[in-house]
Amino acid sequence: MVNMKASMFLTFAGLVLLFVVCYASESEEKEFPREMLSSIFAVDNDFKQEERDCAGYMRECKEKLCCSGYVCSSRWKWRVLPAPWRR
C-alpha cells in the first residue's frame, strides 16, 4: 500500500515537473519563475469585494442602510434576516 502511494506521488510529481519544463522551453522570456508565480497568484478584479452603500448580515445598525432582505434587530442592534416574529 505504501509503495503504491509513493509511486503515485512520484508519478504526479514527474508530470508536474514535465509540465514546468515544457512550459519553460516554450517561454522566450528570462524571468520564467516570476512570470509563472505572477500568473498563478494574479487577482482578478471580479473577485475583489466591492464597497456597497448598505450593510449586510450581522453588521451593526448605525448610519448605513440595511441591504434588501435584512432588518435591524431591535434587541441585538445588528442586521438579521426577517422572520414572521420580527415584523
Swiss-Prot record:
Location in or out of the cell: Secreted
InterPro entries: Huwentoxin-1 (IPR011696)
Superkingdom, taxonomy of origin: Eukaryota
GO cellular component: a single term: extracellular region
Disulfide bonds: C54-C67, C61-C72
Tissue specificity comment: Expressed by the venom gland.
MF terms (GO), sorted A to Z: ion channel inhibitor activity; toxin activity
Record function comment: Ion channel inhibitor.
Free-text note regarding domains: The presence of a 'disulfide through disulfide knot' structurally defines this protein as a knottin.
Family to which this protein belongs: Belongs to the neurotoxin 10 (Hwtx-1) family. 51 (Hntx-8) subfamily. Hntx-8 sub-subfamily.
UniProt-recorded name of the protein: U3-theraphotoxin-Hhn1b
Lineage, highest ranks first: Eukaryota, Metazoa, Ecdysozoa, Arthropoda, Chelicerata
